[in-house]
Amino acid sequence: MTTAAADNPGLPHTRSQAHHLTGFWLVTGAVVILQAFATLPTPLWPLYAQRDGLSSTLVTVAFAAIVVGTVAGLTFFGHLSDRLGRRRIIVPALFVGIVAAVVMMTWPAYPGLLAGRFLTGLAVGVVASTATTYLSDLYRAARPSSSTRFPSTVASIAILGGLSLGPLVSGALAQWFTAPLITPYLVFIVAMAVGIVAVLVSPETVERRAFHKERAPRFRLRAGQRLAFIGASAVAFCSFGGFGVLLSLGSLIVQNELHVTAPFIWGLASFVALGVSAISQVALGALSPRWMLGLGTGAVAAGFLVIIIGLFNPSMTLFLIGAAIGGAGLGLLFKSALAVAVPAADPASRAGVIARFYTTAYIGQGLPPVLLAFATSFVS
């Protein structure tokens, strides 16, 4: 065992390293669960619209309420893990996610949707930057000689892969189980409780520091990295903007324009787009950020063109093909942006820098869909 570790320094050769590697995958699982919860309502929006008599604009605003919470979480809490520790931030965030599920399950009115989505965003915002940094810490401790790109890739896949699972799981539960607006939340309450346990048994990677001691600035980049970070944030904005349109309006489009009545199918386009986005990062993640940016841009343009064709000549098949192509492109755009943003951060303020990066990305997820919904309602 010792010889194998010596021959391959990438293998964890101490109990501590093994513990950190186990924690790496446990925290990854917790991130996937919370991200999946964030997109849980995607196939349920038509049901909410029917129950509460909501227009597509009000549905989009309810969807975008998550962005307000996310930005608040990133702005006010996203940097705190650099000082308080990673687990001390992620565990309360998962508790907030459970509260959000309870609110959306037990408050059957539009204000309940808004409150639940805001709390969901608060949890997602806190975890987004903290978990990305936490995964990097854990993997570096487990495999000091390995590439730093791997944890960044895993974090990106966990975020987008988790987002893809939400519509699939909730759509299946709504389709084949009773109480479609309650059962999915019960399942995810249990899942998030499991996520809390997973984080609690993972090792902490930051020593808690008192607030009166000298502290690192919330946001500080390495020398010469400002333009690179700004560019990466802009790309993340565009990537999440595309996902936001699919997540907020995709189910209503499938129901109203393609005349599909099954909740499972309502969430399928979002699952395909986000799932393929995660797969594309695995398949092409070794490319340079420049290549990923170019390929991603082309795929997004092609994908949305196919979606438009599928709407003008109603075809669920074309819609799904377009969602897959566009999703692959959006995933590559996000991966290229994250690959530039992470190394641009000063080591002492990584969580704060990544919080700023995700703030821009999540604003992109909410703002374009809301503007599109208002523009559509104005034209119609």
Predicted features and spans:
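Helix-breaking motifs and short loop linkers at transmembrane-helix boundaries and internal kinks
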Residues: 53, 85, 106-111, 178, ...
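Conserved MFS/SLC helix-loop-helix module at the cytosolic interface between two early adjacent transmembrane helices
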Residues: 71-111
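Paired small-residue
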Residues: 111-123, 317-325
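Cytoplasmic helix-loop-helix junction between adjacent transmembrane helices
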Residues: 116-157
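Helix-loop-helix hairpin linking two adjacent transmembrane segments in secondary transporters
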Residues: 146, 153-200
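Transmembrane alpha-helices of Major Facilitator/SLC transporters
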Residues: 265-289, 299, 303
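C-terminal transmembrane helical hairpin of 12-TM major facilitator-type secondary transporters
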Residues: 291-337
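A late C-terminal transmembrane helix in Major Facilitator Superfamily
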Residues: 338-379
